[in-house]
Amino acid sequence: TDVYTRRTESQSDWLLSRLAMYWKSHATEVYVKGEVFDHAGGEKAPAPTVRYTGTRGTAATHGRPKLEDIVPYDDNEDGNVTFCNNALEGRPLESVHPSKTGRNIENLNCEILGIARDAAFLYWMTGEEKYAKLAAGVFDTYMTGIYYRKVPVDLNHGHQQTLVGLTSFEVIHEDALHIVVPLYDFLYNYLKSNYPDKMIIYAGALKKWADNIIANGVPHNNWDLLQARYVMNVGLVLEDNKEYTDGKGREYYIDYVMNRSSIRQWSLTRLADYGFDINTGIWAECPGYSSVVINDYANFVNQFDTNLQYDLVKAMPILSKAVATTPEYLFPNRMICGFGDTHPG
């Protein structure tokens, strides 16, 4: 972190200028065709907006350069990015359409946001303003860019429209949001003192993110819990409902996670009633999806207890049975069977 802090001290925009943004076009609309990025456009926002990633999958002909090799403020009239051609010796930099880059655009932004988050943590720990300046520059640029960006439109008018996030093709892979939330939390007092007029923008960006995760996704399986985790984390760093003109603050989003259901986002209680067998505690998906679900519920138990002093196990007694049933997935050699996305680790 200190390496980038020193660079930022000598050139204030060194790190933030390497974010993947629509620096020149300020595009507000993003258009995809199924699982592939097509183009960006729409009205010009008052500030640079966040670039959308290339594809739903990870396959890419062009990879992102090292951070120091990223072209600052990289944006041309064709909407291309300057990335490395993986097929050529030396991986030379080329201007390439984002659809050739897999998920590297969002990953680049996550790397930069991660550096900013670590700097925010160091500021919170030490009080040294140099860390706050680095973190705030990146955070302000990125979150303002999220605030003015709209949810992507699928030109194929297909199922993908119900899955897209603001930065990723799946709402369950809005990885940047997992980084932004603690960044905001650690940096909150500094932002409130130095960016007071932007606090409503930051909250608006977080709420837009959460609202889209609620609106999209899959409600009746493991996706729902992954979505709920994002929404819960946003709720915990917002102010009370009364602080926002739309009445949507901390209580609103936490209540949505616990008690409310919509077409693509079920409450924790409704999902548990639907997914766990009342007699055995077995989850209605194959392993390892089932083990992931139990782990996520256990994390929610801890989160509710730590932050809200609320006993989720008392509210959902089936969780005790589900945890106790977990060893039943093991073979005698302590291995488990797995289907789908199950990973050996």
Question: Which positions does each model-derived feature cover?
Answer:
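Extracellular glycan-targeting catalytic surfaces
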Residues: 1-236, 298
